[in-house]
Regions:
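Canonical Radical SAM [4Fe-4S] cluster-binding loop centered on the CxxxCxxC motif
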Residues: 16-55
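Conserved beta-strand segments that form the floor/walls of ligand-binding pockets within enzyme
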Residues: 22, 26, 74, 163, ...
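A detector for short, charged/polar N-terminal pre-domain segments
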Residues: 9-15
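Radical SAM/AdoMet-radical enzyme domain recognition
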Residues: 52-75, 82-194
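Accessory C-terminal segments flanking Radical SAM cores
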Residues: 200-275
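Class I S-adenosyl-L-methionine
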Residues: 177-181, 197-200, 205-206
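A short acidic, helix-capping loop that chelates divalent metal ions and anchors anionic groups
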Residues: 43-48, 132-139, 199-205
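Residue-level signature of catalytic and energy-coupling elements of molecular machines
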Residues: 27, 191, 274
Length: 275
């Protein structure tokens, strides 16, 4: 990484010429779910609480990165909203004058609607891998499906842009691709299909991978090709964007296994312990 100036503005540029202006901050390793593809059944060894960044440290680091040209900050976890001082962190980061957003499992967002609005958060990514209540319980090892959907409706009704992240696993939820697409018919939400990635302890198996090509092929079985529109990708976007003609919402595919996107990466990732 190196600092360069362009029109007297600082920016962070790596050895490959990529400018990094998007900061992802994990504010906790804790989560109130136990998703099978994310966490082994026996759990994981968490970093000691004394090593986790304080709210002051998070805000101080974020301010430094904003001064170095960062334009967008995303809060992640674990589940960011289980952190006890999450509200304070959100409020303080909302004063930095950059785009602020979050990836969450959605279970606690009802407690933060007004905080989100005050901090300028207008969109959230919600993790939801199935539309089947029993499958949800199976994959998350928790029974919160109805509560999650109540919160998704709450976000939509409060005019937040909702993007639903769906990790596809062959033989488990790939049969629901069209069901997810149909969610976009009348509601302006975005479904983001994510290829199942290797992760330490998640029992990754290549045979469980549903590829970008297979996802589109499945959609083609129900919609004529001319009705599946390829829409514009944003610069440095990790997703390939599409929508069904005349549908209110859209869908995209993050093909991180079959089409790695590191060449245009603009992200800086900060772990909960500041690394």
């Amino acid at each position: 990484m190196a600092l360069t100036t362009e029109n007297k503005m600082l920016k962070i540029e790596d050895l490959h010429g990529r400018v990094h202006d998007y900061l992802r901050i994990s504010i906790t390793e804790n989560c109130n779910l136990r998703c099978t593809y994310c966490m082994p059944a026996e759990g994981i060894n968490l970093t000691p609480k004394s090593h986790i960044m304080t709210a002051d440290e998070i805000v101080s680091i974020a301010k430094t990165f904003v001064a170095l040209g960062v334009k967008k900050i995303r809060l992640t976890g674990g589940e960011p909203l289980v952190r006890k001082d999450a509200r304070t962190i959100i409020e303080r980061l909302g004063n930095l004058g950059v785009e602020l957003t979050m990836t969450t499992n959605g279970l606690l967002v009802h407690e933060y609607i007004e905080t989100f609005k005050a901090a300028g958060i207008t969109s959230l990514n919600i993790s939801l891998d199935t539309l089947n209540k029993e499958k949800y319980k199976q994959i998350t090892r928790r029974d919160h499906y109805d509560a999650l959907w109540k919160n998704i409706h709450l976000l939509v009704n409060n005019n937040f842009k909702v993007r639903i992240n769906v990790v596809l696993i062959k033989g488990f939820n790939d049969c629901e691709i069209l069901d997810f697409i149909n969610l976009t018919k009348d509601v302006n939400i975005q479904i983001r299909f994510i290829e199942f990635m290797p992760f330490n302890g998640n029992q990754w198996d290549k045979s469980k991978l549903v590829t970008y090509a297979e996802i589109l092929e499945k959609i083609h079985t129900h919609f004529p090709l001319e009705n599946i529109l390829r829409t514009e990708d944003k610069p440095n976007d990790t997703a390939k964007n599409h929508k069904i003609k005349f549908y209110a919402g859209s869908f995209s595919v993050i093909s991180s296994v079959t089409n790695p996107f590191c060449g245009t990466c603009n992200r800086i990732r900060l772990t909960a312990d500041g690394k």
